[in-house]
Amino acid sequence: MEDMMKQILEKLNTIEKNISETNIRIEKIEKEQELKRKVELYGKEPEKKLHKENIEKLSSSIEDKIIQNIDKKLKKIENVEEQYQWKNIVKINKPLSVGEKYMENFKKILVYLGEKHPKLEELYSLTDYNKLVADIYTDRNLVISAYNYGLLQVLYIEHPSQLELFDENIKLAYMKFRNVTKAQLIYMRIYSAMAEPYDKGVIPKIEIIKFGITYSKLKYDEVYEHQPIEKLDLKKFISQKRALGILVIQKEIENLNGNVWLYSNLDGRLILSNHNKAENVEVKNILSDWSKKLSIPEGNYPRCSIKNPMFTGKTMEVLCELSKKQINMRHICNLCSKMKNVQIQDPILPEYEEEYVEIEKEEPGEEKNLEDVSTDDNNEKKKIRSVIVKET
């Protein structure tokens, strides 16, 4: 009887082992199929294949490479006073709030971009505002870090794998755009009003991402000298750049004239591409609401995905003053009358030169026209509500 029980137990163990091995093989096959699907969708990486676990590892440590380089620089500094300044940047032992953590990482990336670290074995350019201009040779962690903090100007895309660390909406928009062009060089231009930290968190960035084609890469050879990052009033700097970014976005929307393909309108971000024959009423209404929201920040416009709060009171003051200096720039806020005698110094609105070719192929499918529910100024005033965060 005991021998029979032993035999039964052995058979059960064998069956359990076989089931376990079968499950492992099934899981392996599923992973291979998923990897094959991604390769078919996004293409193979030209140099090194990134597996799923490696991508997750890269994504989880986006800022680590930048932070490590700053820590190495700190160890090499012999001057005690200068070392103290760098320790103030890192602040390893002090617990930080979400807003403070954002500012620390933002400062590190600014330092990193400004130094053009010689050990990086990569090719990239910087604009006069120290924003990154990246291509296929640029380190991808640096590209996604610069993008996350509103410091990426242009990404020249020669292969889909360059977007592997970006979110799905950007990747899908790129694939749709690539399907209607045979161009070898596609650019992704970002018009961004960087995120703004305050005492309770971070106000998300506002941005337009525009895809287009070009025959050559623009390279910014001259980078203006800036005030040392260690001496910079970072809150004031971010307020000025966010306000300036809002004006840049507003100007770009006006230049589009509604002739675009719109891929996404979510969470304060538009993803689009130029099209000189696109006349979709729904898209024009969305762009109209975006333009109104940027011109009248305290208004409420349902087709605009910018969420409140839109900025802090300090940024509102900067935006109000800068708007007065722009020709044909509409702006209305509750500070307009109070800001008459306030002078705020900030760079003029930058002019960006872009070389692109518009896609003339029609997008398949019929256009769906929605009723235009635009409001006049009287109705807008009735909808006014606060979008300003008061800093403590």
Swiss-Prot record:
Its main location: host cell. It is found in: Host cytoplasm. Residues 1-88 form a coiled coil. Transmembrane segments: none annotated. GO terms for cellular component: host cell cytoplasm. Keywords: Coiled coil, Host cytoplasm, Translation regulation. Residues 358-392 are annotated as: Disordered. Disulfide bonds: none annotated. GO terms for biological process: regulation of translation. Belongs to the caulimoviridae viroplasmin family. The inclusion bodies are the site of viral DNA synthesis, virion assembly and accumulation in the infected cell. Enhances the translation of downstream ORFs on polycistronic mRNAs derived from cassava vein mosaic virus. This is Putative transactivator/viroplasmin protein.
